[in-house]
């Protein structure tokens, strides 16, 4: 340990003692300040400012970045990730996907485990929703847009366009009410003095009858504020379709493009990309109904090298034009091998599996809902992959949580619950009751004397 003197300067190569500081006038530097090409504020030319702003590229990002108009009726932000999302045509399918639709640049595969074709209904709904979006924008005031949605169908079935479902207009009673309300809304000489019909007389005569009005509103049901706000902001985002009607008029070539899957893979991919480029600034919805159907695909397409090459190319196009392309495909998994199915699932961002009920389960549901046939469900819905969430590593796999039913008017997906058969329960209770009653009788009646003879 070393000690230094109090006046010694540390790390000084000069003298050891530190003298007092000398104060004097400030020194003037011999080198002038480097001012450069400074200008007074306000003397910058306007041309230089405009040139700098152009380099910043602060234009309308909704058109340059997304490739779509910000006012597109078929696009809304995802409530989970805020990504631009479009509807699949089924509100229930939009809900279980987790984004209220399918995010742009993503794909969904709907697979079915039997020979039924419930998946074809979802494919038609997906295509019909795109046609409706295109016609809504085409009927706007801006006639130069010529629509903002285009549908590409990879299929040989030319009747697919004529089989698209129409928009649900309500029941017969609701349609009659709508016609009556439209007639009453028209201003004519007859209904000028009939405006009092809109308010029932009991609300005018009895002041205390306001509570009956509230009771009627509760009975009829009123939507929540959030639902009202969402519906008012995105009123044309999703539509309810009637699968018993047809979309009229049928889609034309400017709205829907057919591509034959019997062509070579390179030709199919080039035609898809040309269609995407030709319909610039439009939302492209690619539909592949009944993938690998033997009636539409050649035998060589069932080889893994061919079909995986096709789906890999389509997936690359979806990711290349991610700002305005979505993909929907459906397949029956009974006609392909399990290894090929695994490879196909890896090509899609989301996978939904439909498992129709067998005959025994169908008969059980028909017996349980004998008085309510509208509640009969037709199968289970399994969620194997979800868009965006699965890519993030979130294992959102749900099996036997949802069920689907193909109703008279629409395709529905709802939560699954095993129903209780009241007939079996009542029969079991009656049997147990009769058994207990016979036991009571046997206990009350004295036992008869029995005589047993033993012969040796």
Swiss-Prot record:
It is found in: Cytoplasm; Nucleus. The modification Phosphoserine is found at residue 222. Its main location: cytoplasm. InterPro entries: Elongator_complex_protein_4, P-loop_NTPase. One of its GO terms (cellular component) is nucleoplasm. The keyword Phosphoprotein applies. It comes from the Eukaryota. The modification Omega-N-methylarginine is found at residue 13. Component of the elongator complex which consists of ELP1/IKI3, ELP2, ELP3, ELP4, ELP5/IKI1 and ELP6. The elongator complex is composed of two copies of the Elp123 subcomplex (composed of ELP1/IKI3, ELP2 and ELP3) and two copies of the Elp456 subcomplex (composed of ELP4, ELP5/IKI1 and ELP6). The Elp123 subcomplex forms a two-lobed scaffold, which binds the Elp456 subcomplex asymmetrically. In each lobe, ELP2 is tightly sandwiched between ELP1/IKI3 and ELP3. The Elp123 subcomplex binds tRNA through ELP1/IKI3 and ELP3 and can bind 2 tRNAs simultaneously. This is Elongator complex protein 4. It comes from Saccharomyces cerevisiae (strain ATCC 204508 / S288c).
